[in-house]
């Protein structure tokens, strides 16, 4: 696949008229220009939902936010988008709001294995430290979708210090997995602080 195909160039120009190939290859440009609205997807893919569909999809994104990077959007086939696997992974579905008897808000039981907020300690020698709740793209199948994108639960340094102290005081822990969201969306300074602590 080309690094900057004709379709990608076209999308980049719709997003930002002055977009260049160097923008397209810059991950920060993609994060800044993530598509977060139903109307944005319609405009960029040249598709159209009915007003009823649009409203139902908005109801879904109110509970589970949407973010699709321009790159992922460029992989979607607008001619057959409803059957496109990338579209289904990235685009909200009204089925996400349907709760079945067997559905759980915490399917991995991370909260049960959480001795302090933001840390999961399920196995004796390793912990999972939740350092971010943001991703470049919000996958619709995410097992943490109840937290991802929630601006009210972005971990602060004080929140993270509780987890760090727990790790320091638990000598059997030898592996610490940084998780989220995507930890690599944190600033270099924040990652440096986490790894130093």
Show which residues each predicted segment covers:
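Flexible, acidic/Gly-rich N-terminal and inter-domain linker regions that tether
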Residues: 1-121
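Short pre-active-site segment immediately N-terminal to redox-active cysteine/selenocysteine motifs
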Residues: 134-138
């Amino acid at each position: 696949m080309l690094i900057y195909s004709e379709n990608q160039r076209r999308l980049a120009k719709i997003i930002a008229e002055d977009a260049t190939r160097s923008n397209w290859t810059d991950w920060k440009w993609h994060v800044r220009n993530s598509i977060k609205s139903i109307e944005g997807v319609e405009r960029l893919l040249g598709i159209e939902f009915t007003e009823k569909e649009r409203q139902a999809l908005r109801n879904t994104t109110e509970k589970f936010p949407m973010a699709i990077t321009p790159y992922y959007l460029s992989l979607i086939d607008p001619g057959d988008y409803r059957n496109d696997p990338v579209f289904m992974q990235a685009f909200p579905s009204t089925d996400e709001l349907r709760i079945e008897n067997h559905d759980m808000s915490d399917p991995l039981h991370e909260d049960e294995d959480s001795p302090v907020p933001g840390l999961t300690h399920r196995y004796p020698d390793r912990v999972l430290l939740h350092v971010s709740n943001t991703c470049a793209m919000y996958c619709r199948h995410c097992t943490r979708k109840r937290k991802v994108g929630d601006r009210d639960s972005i971990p602060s340094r004080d929140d993270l210090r509780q987890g760090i102290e727990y790790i320091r005081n638990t000598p059997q822990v030898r592996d610490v997995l940084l998780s989220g969201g995507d930890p690599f969306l944190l600033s270099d300074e924040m990652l440096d602080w986490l790894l130093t602590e």
